[in-house]
Design a protein with these regions (language model features):
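Active-site glycine-rich loops that stabilize anionic/oxyanionic intermediates
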Residues: 99, 104-110
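N-terminal targeting or regulatory segments adjacent to alpha/beta-hydrolase or S9 domains
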Residues: 1-69, 124, 282-283
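C-terminal catalytic histidine-bearing segment of alpha/beta-hydrolase fold enzymes
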Residues: 3-10, 240-283
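N-terminal cap/lid segment of alpha/beta-hydrolase-fold proteins
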Residues: 52-97
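Short beta-to-alpha linker loops that shape the active-site pocket of alpha/beta-hydrolase fold enzymes
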Residues: 90, 132-137, 207, 257
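The feature captures the conserved acid-bearing segment of alpha/beta-hydrolase catalytic domains
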Residues: 207-253, 259
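Primarily recognizes the serine-hydrolase "nucleophile elbow" in alpha/beta-hydrolase
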Residues: 158-212
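Cap/lid segment of the alpha/beta-hydrolase catalytic domain
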Residues: 113-155
Length: 283
């Protein structure tokens, strides 16, 4: 039986659950919400299964860091040229010949994270391969998971997973994903549709709507963060995504955050990855 953990009971005050508009009332309403898991994902399935990657190039960048190697990755997929940023540990940061690799996906209205930010993964002994695609906004996702912009990005993410497994020095059995907002939605979809499944997935305030249709397909463990003040990714819809998962899962709910980066959750993500791959934590 899969393991399910959440801090929801810590946030609900029984005496306030019947008062409309309170955190306790909202969470009582959200607790068992499963949404509408009937979205048509046939186009996503087709796109994610047709992964003929061509012309893969890995171009080294010299940042003179003795503990990390940096490269720009590109390949062709279905008429598109997909770009990514690759960082892998080296020197004293490399714990083994084959290392785990994090697939990283960014949110709407934001570009790929910088090299400096992502170097943290190398310091922990992980490689990271981040999708470097054009920035889109919420208006591009109005059709939920059937939105062309989302359907376009999911096979890019699945192709990155395929590429990652074949890179020298990467452990094909320890590929995992992390994303916020749109990136969280892409990470979840890749975990659900990737032919081998991912070792684990972390996501915060995932979007677009309709992701609960993919939840039952996710393999590997999941850590999910939800901000109750989020007006971009509906918190109630996020509960549907979490409640649809059938794998080991943990849900951390934040009452006082909106659609934003949560440093405390990033710490939880690091802890989650370390416990998954190295049996250690920050605690």
């Amino acid at each position: 039986m899969s393991k399910c953990e959440s801090n929801i009971d810590e946030l609900i005050v029984p005496e306030l659950a019947g008062i409309a508009g309170t955190v306790s009332s909202r969470l009582s309403d959200f607790r068992d919400w499963r949404g509408d898991a009937s979205a048509d994902v046939s186009e996503l399935e087709t796109a994610a299964s047709d992964l003929e990657v061509c012309g893969l190039t890995v171009t080294a960048i010299d940042f003179a860091n003795p503990c990390a190697r940096y490269s720009e990755v590109s390949f062709e997929l279905g008429g598109y040229v997909v770009h990514g940023r690759l960082i892998e540990p080296s020197g004293c940061a490399r714990r083994s010949e084959l290392v785990p690799l994090c697939l990283m996906f960014h949110d709407i209205d934001r570009p790929v994270r910088g090299w400096h930010h992502m170097t943290r993964f190398a310091a922990m002994g992980y490689a990271v391969l981040a999708l470097d695609d054009e920035t889109i906004g919420s208006s591009d996702l109005q059709q939920g998971i059937t939105s062309p912009a989302f359907v376009e990005r999911v096979p890019w993410g699945c192709a990155l997973a395929k590429v990652a497994r074949n890179l020298d020095g990467m452990d094909p059995d320890r590929i995992f994903a992390w994303g916020e907002g749109l990136g969280g939605g892409v990470a979840l979809a890749v975990s659900a549709l990737d032919e081998r499944g991912l070792a684990c997935t972390a996501l915060a305030n995932p979007l677009p709507s309709g992701l609960e249709t993919l939840s039952p397909r996710v393999r590997g463990s999941v850590l999910m963060g939800t901000s109750l003040m989020d007006t971009v990714s509906d918190p109630k819809g996020q509960f549907a995504v979490f409640n649809g998962l059938e794998c080991d899962r943990r849900h951390i709910i934040y009452a006082k955050y909106a659609h934003e980066r949560i440093n405390a959750f990033e710490n939880e993500v690091v802890d989650f990855f370390n416990q998954t791959f190295y049996s250690c934590s920050l605690a």
